[in-house]
Amino acid sequence: MEVEVGQIVNTHGIKGEVKVKSNSDFTETRFQPGEQLLVKHNNTEIVYTVDSYRIHKGFHMLRFEGINNINDIEHLKGDYIYQERDHQDIELGEHEYYYSDIIGCTVFKDDDTPIGRVINIFETGANDVWIVKGEKEYLIPYIEDVVKDIDIENKTIKITPMEGLLD
């Protein structure tokens, strides 16, 4: 199964490098040279092999094998990048999940009151933070004191909010 790992937001320079906004976990692994990425463009699927990867001003900069100038890649601006969900170099530990498993889950308080749906995730260094869209947008830290149960199969998450978390 493929998961969306990013979006080509722009080109960079004239030698065919692209600026990618990642919305994936494990980008250091997924974007390494030699990795294959799928770009869906105008109802066609194109497989590219990563030739080089670096981070520049918060964006992931990729160059693909065989692409050496801006004209060969510019038409992909705005397109999404996909990769196989299960990657041979990624092992999930206990209580670890792919972002694609968490995004879209409905979050409930421990009294079964719905809060909203996870729409995005960002890393803080200490722990991930889930952006949950309900009546407002809430920032829910993925920590043991808050997140009590994750049911990937039913796409539900139960939390015990800390005081002030949902204000």
Swiss-Prot record:
Q: Where is the signal peptide?
A: none
GO CC, alphabetical = cytoplasm; ribosome
Which SUPFAM superfamilies does the UniProt entry name for this protein?
Answer: PRC-barrel domain, Translation proteins
The PRC barrel domain is annotated at: 94-165
Q: Does the keyword rRNA processing apply?
A: yes
| Compartment(s) where it occurs, according to its Swiss-Prot or TrEMBL record | Cytoplasm
Q: Which InterPro entries match?
A: PRC_barrel-like_sf (IPR011033), PRC_RimM (IPR056792), RimM (IPR011961), RimM_N (IPR002676), RimM_N_sf (IPR036976), Transl_B-barrel_sf (IPR009000)
**GO annotation terms (biological process):** ribosomal small subunit biogenesis; rRNA processing
Q: Keywords for this entry?
A: Chaperone, Cytoplasm, Ribosome biogenesis, rRNA processing
Q: Which GO terms describe its molecular function?
A: ribosome binding
Anything noted about its domains?
Answer: The PRC barrel domain binds ribosomal protein uS19.
Query: Which protein family is it in?
Result: Belongs to the RimM family.
What is its biological role?
Answer: An accessory protein needed during the final step in the assembly of 30S ribosomal subunit, possibly for assembly of the head region. Essential for efficient processing of 16S rRNA. May be needed both before and after RbfA during the maturation of 16S rRNA. It has affinity for free ribosomal 30S subunits but not for 70S ribosomes.
Q: How does it assemble?
A: Binds ribosomal protein uS19.
Q: What is this protein called?
A: Ribosome maturation factor RimM
- The gene from which this protein is expressed is rimM
